[in-house]
Structures are given as structure tokens and as C-alpha cells.
Amino acid sequence: MKSNTSQYIPYNCISANLLENYEYPESPFFRGTGFFVYFPPFDDYIFYVSAKHCFCGYKENNFLEKLKIPYQYKTEENFNNSLDEAVIFSEYLTMKHNEEDDDFEDLIVFVVDKNIKKEKKLLLKTRALRLEHQDNIDKILKNLCNIEGNIRTVGFPQVSKEIDFDTKQARIQPRGFYGKIAIKENDINRYKFKQPSWKEGEYNGFSGSPILEIISFYNSNYEIVMEAIPIGILLSATKH
């Protein structure tokens, strides 16, 4: 990602969605991206967020056991180990824009089991992005739209993922891009990239990636700190 803010991109928050194959359990496959978040002051809860359409074809009660996300951020993994040592999720959440809507949002939130070992929870906490309150996110988005500011994303497109079934090795590389934000007309809470920097073909695999804004603030030592804040999720993209 060519940008002077690339040093602040939190690569370790993301994971490629590794899914167990119904018909061939020993041949898992990748579909989309997801990322870990937490929401102060409820620090006991850690969530994994992705696009719901990444799980099409799976019965809803099988989501939890078929998704295999490693506790540690890795770009190379023996997927036999990943299937055995995967994050345990206790439930998942789906949502609507309001109760009167017939359709659910293309969004799914997995809840990390609170009973996992302390060291594993701490490991996930270091990977998780801090969620802001919605009022703050709305202000950030409004300001970005007014100034046509840049937004960023990072994920695992298909061009950066490889599975070798002979050696049972999975290799993935995170990729990112940025572009100017614009409101998507006639859609509630939908935005789009203008002039995206992605030049490597299709966007397949980016679904579920976090949309990021880099903000600065003063810490307790009155030092300026830069932090990547999730302000949305990438649901779809088309090469023009």
C-alpha cells in the first residue's frame, strides 16, 4: 500500500476466513476477510466481524464450527493445525437497519467465547481494533465526505492466497488500498471508494475487510499517537 499512513495500518487485526469444506473436511478453502474488534468499556467481549455473504451455502447453525480463525496472525500456516487450534466462538449476531426491514444487513459478528484461556484472550485483545461510539463514527464520516478525504482498507484478496493441498500449507499475504470516500446514493449508511489505488485485478477476497481512518490524539504523556479506527466494513467491490 503506497501511502504515508501505511505504517499505521493494523495488519494483525485481520484474518482470511478459512472455512471447513462440507464434502471434503480435509480440504478447507478461503472466502473473504474478517477482523477483530472490541468495544470499551466492555473489554471482556471480543468480536470477529465479516461480510455475511462470505458464508453463503452454510446452514446458519454451522457458522460457528465451520469458521477456522487462528489465534495468532500468520501469513503461512499448516491448515491441519488451524483446524484443530482455532478461535472458539460462542454465538453470532446479525442485524437490520431497523426492526421494520425485511432483510438483514450483509454483516455478521462472531462473539469470541468468554471462557477461552486468559493468554488466548490477551492475544486476541492485542489484535482487536477499538470501536468508537456510533456518534463519533458519524462525525468522522461526515467530515471525510465534506473534504473528500481518503479511506483505507486491508484484507486478503484471492490474488494473495494460496493453498497447497499436498503439503497442507496455506499462504496468504495482506494487501491494501485507499481512495476517496463518497456517499452512495439511495442507500442508507452506504459509502463508496472513488479513485481507488488498487491496480492488481479483481477485488475478490476483500469482502469483510475493515474500512479504516487514521486519527491522531494525545496520550496520557501528552504525546501525539496515531491510531487506526474502524469506520465501516467493505461489502462489495467491482473493477471498472
Language model regions located:
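Beta-rich catalytic cores
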Residues: 30, 106, 207
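A mid-sequence, solvent-exposed acidic-amphipathic segment
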Residues: 155-199, 204
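Acidic, polar low-complexity intrinsically disordered regions
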Residues: 69-102, 109-110, 117-137
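Short, solvent-exposed loop/turn segments that connect beta-strands within catalytic domains
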Residues: 23-28, 40-45, 103, 216-228
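Terminal peptide-recognition signature
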Residues: 34, 50, 110, 148, ...
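Catalytic histidine site
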Residues: 4-91, 113-116, 180-182, 192, ...
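Catalytic nucleophile loop of clan PA
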Residues: 197-233
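Short glycine/Trp-rich loop-beta-loop segment that forms part of the substrate-binding cleft
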Residues: 128-171
